[in-house]
Amino acid sequence: MFWESAEHATERISPILDSVTIAIGNRDECQIAVGTRDPDEAADRLLARGLEMAVVKLGGDGVMVATADGRRERIPPFPVEVVCGLGSGDAFGGAFCHGLLSGWDPVECVRYGNAAGAIVASRLMCADDMPTVAEVEAFLAERAGDPGEHATSAATAATSQENHQ
Protein backbone atom coordinates (compact mmCIF):
# COMPACT_ATOMS: atom_id res chain seq x y z
CA MET A 1 0.00 0.00 0.00
CA PHE A 2 1.21 3.51 -0.75
CA TRP A 3 -0.27 4.91 2.45
CA GLU A 4 1.01 4.85 6.02
CA SER A 5 -2.08 2.89 7.07
CA ALA A 6 -5.54 1.90 5.90
CA GLU A 7 -6.97 4.76 7.95
CA HIS A 8 -4.62 7.25 6.27
CA ALA A 9 -5.65 5.92 2.87
CA THR A 10 -9.32 6.38 3.75
CA GLU A 11 -8.67 9.95 4.93
CA ARG A 12 -6.98 10.78 1.63
CA ILE A 13 -9.41 8.97 -0.67
CA SER A 14 -12.72 9.97 0.90
CA PRO A 15 -12.67 13.65 -0.15
CA ILE A 16 -11.78 12.70 -3.71
CA LEU A 17 -14.96 10.64 -4.09
CA ASP A 18 -16.97 13.87 -4.22
CA SER A 19 -15.32 14.59 -7.59
CA VAL A 20 -15.70 11.11 -9.08
CA THR A 21 -18.30 10.01 -11.62
CA ILE A 22 -17.46 6.29 -11.79
CA ALA A 23 -15.55 4.18 -9.26
CA ILE A 24 -14.09 0.74 -9.94
CA GLY A 25 -12.62 -1.34 -7.14
CA ASN A 26 -12.34 -4.77 -5.64
CA ARG A 27 -13.63 -5.58 -2.16
CA ASP A 28 -10.40 -4.51 -0.45
CA GLU A 29 -10.37 -1.20 -2.31
CA CYS A 30 -14.01 -0.63 -1.39
CA GLN A 31 -13.15 -1.26 2.25
CA ILE A 32 -10.56 1.52 2.07
CA ALA A 33 -12.78 3.89 0.09
CA VAL A 34 -16.12 3.50 1.87
CA GLY A 35 -15.57 1.25 4.87
CA THR A 36 -17.16 -2.01 3.72
CA ARG A 37 -16.26 -5.11 1.72
CA ASP A 38 -19.92 -5.95 1.08
CA PRO A 39 -20.47 -5.22 -2.62
CA ASP A 40 -24.04 -3.98 -2.34
CA GLU A 41 -23.29 -1.76 0.64
CA ALA A 42 -20.14 -0.44 -1.04
CA ALA A 43 -22.11 0.42 -4.17
CA ASP A 44 -24.81 2.10 -2.08
CA ARG A 45 -22.23 4.18 -0.23
CA LEU A 46 -20.47 5.19 -3.43
CA LEU A 47 -23.72 6.14 -5.14
CA ALA A 48 -24.78 8.10 -2.04
CA ARG A 49 -21.65 10.22 -2.56
CA GLY A 50 -23.06 11.31 -5.92
CA LEU A 51 -21.33 8.88 -8.26
CA GLU A 52 -23.18 7.83 -11.40
CA MET A 53 -21.78 4.29 -11.38
CA ALA A 54 -20.10 1.91 -8.94
CA VAL A 55 -18.27 -1.17 -10.20
CA VAL A 56 -17.27 -3.72 -7.57
CA LYS A 57 -14.98 -6.55 -8.69
CA LEU A 58 -15.78 -9.81 -6.92
CA GLY A 59 -12.85 -11.98 -7.93
CA GLY A 60 -14.01 -15.40 -9.09
CA ASP A 61 -17.62 -14.32 -8.57
CA GLY A 62 -17.47 -11.74 -11.36
CA VAL A 63 -18.34 -8.06 -11.15
CA MET A 64 -21.28 -6.09 -9.80
CA VAL A 65 -22.26 -2.79 -11.40
CA ALA A 66 -24.73 -0.34 -9.88
CA THR A 67 -25.93 2.93 -11.36
CA ALA A 68 -27.49 6.04 -9.87
CA ASP A 69 -30.74 5.30 -11.71
CA GLY A 70 -31.24 2.16 -9.63
CA ARG A 71 -29.86 -0.50 -11.94
CA ARG A 72 -27.81 -3.24 -10.27
CA GLU A 73 -26.40 -6.26 -12.10
CA ARG A 74 -23.92 -9.03 -11.37
CA ILE A 75 -21.94 -10.21 -14.35
CA PRO A 76 -20.25 -13.60 -14.00
CA PRO A 77 -16.62 -14.11 -15.02
CA PHE A 78 -15.39 -16.05 -18.01
CA PRO A 79 -13.78 -19.25 -16.76
CA VAL A 80 -10.20 -19.62 -18.00
CA GLU A 81 -7.14 -21.50 -16.86
CA VAL A 82 -5.21 -18.82 -14.99
CA VAL A 83 -1.53 -18.69 -15.93
CA CYS A 84 -0.76 -15.34 -14.33
CA GLY A 85 -3.29 -12.90 -12.91
CA LEU A 86 -0.94 -9.91 -13.09
CA GLY A 87 -2.34 -7.24 -15.36
CA SER A 88 -5.85 -8.67 -15.58
CA GLY A 89 -7.22 -5.75 -13.56
CA ASP A 90 -5.51 -3.29 -15.87
CA ALA A 91 -6.96 -5.10 -18.85
CA PHE A 92 -10.41 -5.00 -17.24
CA GLY A 93 -10.12 -1.27 -16.57
CA GLY A 94 -8.89 -0.41 -20.04
CA ALA A 95 -11.52 -2.52 -21.75
CA PHE A 96 -14.25 -1.15 -19.48
CA CYS A 97 -13.22 2.42 -20.37
CA HIS A 98 -13.15 1.47 -24.07
CA GLY A 99 -16.77 0.40 -23.73
CA LEU A 100 -17.76 3.57 -21.88
CA LEU A 101 -16.09 5.78 -24.46
CA SER A 102 -17.87 3.79 -27.17
CA GLY A 103 -21.24 4.55 -25.55
CA TRP A 104 -21.99 0.98 -24.48
CA ASP A 105 -24.39 -0.11 -21.77
CA PRO A 106 -22.62 -0.58 -18.38
CA VAL A 107 -23.22 -4.36 -18.42
CA GLU A 108 -21.60 -4.66 -21.84
CA CYS A 109 -18.66 -2.58 -20.58
CA VAL A 110 -18.21 -5.00 -17.66
CA ARG A 111 -18.59 -8.05 -19.88
CA TYR A 112 -15.97 -6.68 -22.27
CA GLY A 113 -13.70 -5.89 -19.32
CA ASN A 114 -14.19 -9.40 -17.94
CA ALA A 115 -13.20 -10.85 -21.31
CA ALA A 116 -10.04 -8.73 -21.54
CA GLY A 117 -9.08 -9.61 -17.96
CA ALA A 118 -9.65 -13.31 -18.62
CA ILE A 119 -7.47 -13.19 -21.71
CA VAL A 120 -4.60 -11.60 -19.79
CA ALA A 121 -5.00 -14.03 -16.87
CA SER A 122 -4.68 -16.93 -19.32
CA ARG A 123 -1.31 -15.65 -20.56
CA LEU A 124 2.15 -15.64 -19.03
CA MET A 125 3.01 -11.99 -19.57
CA CYS A 126 0.83 -9.03 -18.74
CA ALA A 127 1.96 -5.73 -20.30
CA ASP A 128 3.26 -7.43 -23.44
CA ASP A 129 0.14 -9.58 -23.73
CA MET A 130 -2.67 -7.06 -23.40
CA PRO A 131 -5.38 -8.12 -25.85
CA THR A 132 -6.36 -6.17 -28.92
CA VAL A 133 -9.95 -5.27 -29.70
CA ALA A 134 -9.98 -8.08 -32.28
CA GLU A 135 -8.78 -10.60 -29.68
CA VAL A 136 -11.44 -9.57 -27.16
CA GLU A 137 -14.15 -9.74 -29.82
CA ALA A 138 -12.95 -13.19 -30.93
CA PHE A 139 -12.88 -14.36 -27.29
CA LEU A 140 -16.46 -13.17 -26.80
CA ALA A 141 -17.61 -14.75 -30.07
CA GLU A 142 -16.05 -18.10 -29.10
CA ARG A 143 -17.86 -18.01 -25.78
CA ALA A 144 -21.32 -16.98 -26.92
CA GLY A 145 -23.64 -18.61 -24.41
CA ASP A 146 -20.99 -18.85 -21.65
CA PRO A 147 -21.91 -17.54 -18.19
CA GLY A 148 -20.17 -14.24 -18.86
CA GLU A 149 -22.42 -13.51 -21.82
CA HIS A 150 -25.48 -12.49 -19.89
CA ALA A 151 -25.77 -10.49 -16.72
CA THR A 152 -27.86 -11.80 -13.89
CA SER A 153 -29.86 -9.58 -11.61
CA ALA A 154 -28.48 -8.94 -8.15
CA ALA A 155 -31.55 -10.60 -6.70
CA THR A 156 -30.77 -13.94 -8.34
CA ALA A 157 -27.00 -13.84 -8.63
CA ALA A 158 -24.62 -15.90 -6.62
CA THR A 159 -21.97 -13.84 -5.44
CA SER A 160 -11.40 -13.26 -12.05
CA GLN A 161 -9.07 -12.76 -9.58
CA GLU A 162 -10.10 -10.28 -6.91
CA ASN A 163 -6.82 -8.63 -6.18
CA HIS A 164 -5.73 -8.66 -9.79
CA GLN A 165 -8.89 -7.47 -11.46
Residue spans for each PLM region:
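Conserved beta-alpha-beta core of the PfkB/ribokinase-like small-molecule kinase fold
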Residues: M1-R45, D61-V63
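Conserved phosphate-binding/catalytic region of the ribokinase-like
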Residues: R37-Q165
